[in-house]
Design a protein with these regions (language model features):
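Acidic/histidine-rich catalytic neighborhood of metal-dependent amide-processing enzymes
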Residues: 1-45, 82
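Active-site-adjacent substrate-binding region
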Residues: 41-129
Length: 129
């Protein structure tokens, strides 16, 4: 899922029932976070609660095994389309990843390496060649 409406609270509300959701959004960069603009962020938990442990573990293992630069962070003031889907009644495992982004909403900045790391991790997760 490539979110587009999580900020207004309906991005994942009308999805068909699936077993698993992988949202690709932005990863936060900040003083109290591990991620940089050159990494893919794997979010373990946000304001909506923890993401699926099995999915998060698989993402970390894929990144580590394939030398993809990554960081695992917790975003207590952040929410994704997966949270919206859960609130709409979907019973699915979920995980959230994205390139590290500095200064969200004002003038978002990331790096090509962070974008590449995110795309590479999505491709591995989906078992694309």
């Amino acid at each position: 899922m490539w979110p587009g409406h999580e900020e207004v609270g309906h991005g994942g509300a009308t999805l068909p029932q699936v077993d698993e959701l992988l949202a690709v959004d932005m990863g936060c960069v900040g003083d109290d976070l591990s991620c940089t603009e050159r990494q893919v962020s794997i979010c373990a938990k946000d304001n909506g609660g923890p993401y699926d442990y099995g999915m998060v573990t698989r993402l970390v293992e894929l990144a580590r095994a394939n030398a993809i630069p990554y960081a695992v962070d917790i975003y207590p003031h952040y929410s994704s389309d997966i949270t919206v889907a859960w609130h709409a009644g979907m019973d699915a495992r979920g995980a959230l990843i994205g390139p590290g982004v500095h200064a969200s909403h004002g003038m978002e900045r990331t790096h090509f390496e962070g974008m590449k790391a995110t795309i590479d991790l999505v491709a591995l997760y989906l078992e694309l060649d």
